[in-house]
Amino acid sequence: MTDINRTLQGRVISDKMEKSMVVAIERTVKHPIYGKFIKRTTKLHVHDENNECGIGDVVEIRECRPLSKTKSWTLVRVVEKAIL
C-alpha cells in the first residue's frame, strides 16, 4: 500500500469556527456536449490548529484521517495572505 497524501490549493471563505475553516477549491470542467469550460467549486472543511488563516488567504491543504463528521483535511501552509 502506498502512502500518497493528496494536496490541494484553495481560498479560505470562512474562518468563524475554532481551529477550523472552510476552503473553496476551484476547478474547470469541460461541458460534455457543448465543450464550454465551466468553473466548479468544492468547499472543504479544514483543520487549522493555530488559527493562523483569515478570509481570502490562499492555502495549501492535505488530506488526512477523518477528524470529525465533515473534516478530513488539514492545513499545510499559507501560500499567500489576503490584503485587507
Swiss-Prot record:
Coiled coil: none
Protein's UniProt keywords contain Ribonucleoprotein: yes
InterPro entries registered for this protein in UniProt: NA-bd_OB-fold, Ribosomal_uS17, Ribosomal_uS17_bact/chlr, Ribosomal_uS17_CS
Biological-process GO terms, alphabetical: translation
UniProt-listed PROSITE patterns: RIBOSOMAL_S17
GO cellular component terms, A-Z: cytosolic small ribosomal subunit
Complexes and interactors: Part of the 30S ribosomal subunit.
Membership in a protein family: Belongs to the universal ribosomal protein uS17 family.
HAMAP family: Ribosomal_uS17_B
Name under which the protein is recorded: Small ribosomal subunit protein uS17
Species: Serratia proteamaculans (strain 568)
